[in-house]
């Protein structure tokens, strides 16, 4: 009896896009969280967008972005790490096909990528982050533009199945290089030797780029983790 083999794990399965934060505020129920309203090029029929009638945006924001594009509500654990002022009216890179989760009463429908220094030798990787930078798409990139790791082009999954832990097998390879470029590093992800089984072939270190060739970067952090 023939059985269908599981598809190879690939960074192309992750829906990475340019997002535009229209407005951000502290989460009312969690001191470590921000709640952002982010445009990322969604179709109006998408089940993950926030209906305009449910938005609570200041009048000046509504006036600035009239007509208001489709948006998602996104919670991020960046409060206390990134100044609130830096979370307003700016382009970011988002993971757009994670299963939405409710964070302290607010449904979050994407994840904002940020760089943080690697833990010093001898310390746990989960050490407290004291300095975080948002990943910046290249100048001129627009909300909804697809970004991908060079050599790993493909069609993302509509929604990643959390039971298969696809993102968890890929994200550990996200990093910045010596020139702050965001990249996927196979070795850092453990995709070498026995770890290559079930993984697609590709570049050892692949930059995160737009179709136009622009590169996504962190402002200053080199050899940093991306999450």
Show the residue positions of the predicted features.
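Phosphate-backbone binding interfaces of nucleic-acid-interacting proteins
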Residues: 1-227
């Amino acid at each position: 009896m023939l059985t269908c083999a599981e598809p190879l794990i690939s960074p192309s399965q992750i829906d990475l896009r340019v997002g535009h934060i229209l407005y951000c505020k502290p989460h009312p129920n969690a001191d470590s969280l921000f709640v952002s309203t982010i445009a990322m090029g969604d179709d109006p029929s998408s089940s993950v967008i926030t209906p305009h009638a449910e938005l609570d945006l200041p009048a000046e924001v509504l006036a600035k972005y009239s007509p208001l594009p489709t948006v998602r509500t996104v919670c991020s654990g960046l409060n206390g790490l990134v100044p609130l002022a830096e979370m307003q009216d700016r382009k970011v890179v988002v993971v757009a096909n994670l299963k939405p989760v409710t964070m302290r009463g607010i449904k979050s429908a994407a994840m904002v990528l940020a760089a943080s220094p690697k833990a010093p030798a001898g310390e746990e990787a989960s050490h407290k982050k004291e300095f975080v930078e948002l990943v910046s798409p290249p100048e001129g990139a627009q909300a909804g533009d697809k970004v991908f790791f060079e050599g790993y082009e493909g069609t993302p999954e509509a929604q990643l199945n959390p039971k298969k832990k696809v993102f968890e097998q890929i994200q550990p390879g996200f990093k910045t290089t010596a020139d702050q470029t965001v990249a996927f590093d196979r070795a850092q992800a453990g995709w070498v030797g026995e770890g290559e089984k079930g993984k697609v072939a590709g570049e050892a270190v692949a930059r995160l780029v737009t179709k136009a060739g622009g590169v996504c970067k962190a402002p200053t952090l080199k050899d940093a983790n991306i999450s």
